Amino acid sequence: MLWLIAIFLFIVILVLLFLLNFYKDPNRTVPKGRNIVAPADGRIISIIDTSKNKLMIKKGLIGKVRIFTKGIAKECYIISIFMSPFDVHINRAPIEGTVKSIKHTKGKFFKAYDLERSFENEKNEIIIKNKKLKVKVIQIAGFLARRIKCYVKKNQKVNKGQKIGMI
């Protein structure tokens, strides 16, 4: 009987350690100057140039890419960052500016590293604009991280590096 209690406690401790790691929120030092910071920790899994001469991707995906870039520009870059369970899941504003729009879309929960299928996942789109730039941060839920929290509201001013949400 004692070994059952030991196994149970071991599993509880593992789950608690995982949750503490998953919800960690270390302090960040935001670089000064005219630059853009990454909105998320993780690994860049793709960079898509949407200009007419560069956009050569699988048939069927091009329409989804155009939907993602709606409200920004005809020519831009889509940078996909995959967050593993061991990365920080807090999202930050890549630029200083004003939140121009927020759009939440219900969807599926496919694996986040599958770029093509992740377009169908639940998502939250935040457009931030300043005098020189307009940036869209798209928070996409996945198989493990299924909830999206948005910390900002429309017309709210944000600083570069400020917390804007969590996946």
Predicted regions and their residues:
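Contiguous, well-folded functional domains in the mature portion of proteins
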Residues: M1-I167
